[in-house]
Amino acid sequence: MIVAVGSTNPVKVEAVRRAFSLFWEADVRGVDVESGVPKEPFGPNAIEGARNRARNALRALNADFGVGIEGGIFHLFGKYYCAGFVWIERKDGVHSTGMSGWFECPEAFLPDMLRGRELGDLMARLSGNENIKREEGAIGFFTRGAVKRVDLYTHGTLMALAKFIAAGRWPR
């Protein structure tokens, strides 16, 4: 089975590899595709970006599954949260979605993010690590490595895989 990930970010590719390998033998490949949304998407834009990445990756590699992971900012109950939205689409058009765990977005970052700055850029400045979004991520920095970005995205991918894992047990 070929699984196309709509990103070459090693964190996203590894998260998908970890999730799929729990259930199937999968050849997981990252491919550079367009998300069609702003670099730091808010709310529905993150969902749209994940969908676009999954579909574009599926087509680009003629894969069995396409996976799009889009980190974004979500506003609920008066606060902003960072999370990863995951869209998985099978080659027959059936899709499923999931999300990673959420964590509160630092309020100090919000003015810059609302103007289009990416969380990864702000974290690079704060941490001194220019590659933080391709490594531990903001959550890894803030939890001192207890939870890493790959963990969040593996969790989100598993949530999106539930429909496919359940197969005949998924209610119609």
Swiss-Prot record:
TM ranges: none
Taxonomy, superkingdom: Archaea
Entry annotated with the keyword Nucleotide-binding: yes
Note on how the cofactor is bound: Binds 1 divalent metal cation per subunit; can use either Mg(2+) or Mn(2+).
Binding site for Mg(2+): 34
Catalysis performed (reactions): XTP + H2O = XDP + phosphate + H(+); ITP + H2O = IDP + phosphate + H(+)
GO MF: ITPase activity; metal ion binding; nucleotide binding; ribonucleoside triphosphate phosphatase activity
Cofactor: Mg(2+); Mn(2+)
Residues reported to bind substrate: 7-12
Keyword field: Hydrolase, Magnesium, Manganese, Metal-binding, Nucleotide metabolism, Nucleotide-binding
Annotated EC: 3.6.1.73
Keyword match Magnesium: yes
A Pfam family: NTPase_I-T
InterPro entries, A to Z: ITPase-like_fam, Non_canon_purine_NTPase, NTPase/PRRC1, YjjX_NTPase
Single Gene Ontology BP annotation: thiamine metabolic process
Assembly and binders: Homodimer.
Function description: Phosphatase that hydrolyzes non-canonical purine nucleotides such as XTP and ITP to their respective diphosphate derivatives. Probably excludes non-canonical purines from DNA/RNA precursor pool, thus preventing their incorporation into DNA/RNA and avoiding chromosomal lesions.
Family to which the UniProt record says this protein belongs: Belongs to the YjjX NTPase family.
UniProt xrefs under PANTHER family: NON-CANONICAL PURINE NTP PHOSPHATASE_PRRC1 DOMAIN-CONTAINING PROTEIN, PTHR34699
Protein name as catalogued: Probable inosine/xanthosine triphosphatase
Organism of derivation: Korarchaeum cryptofilum (strain OPF8)
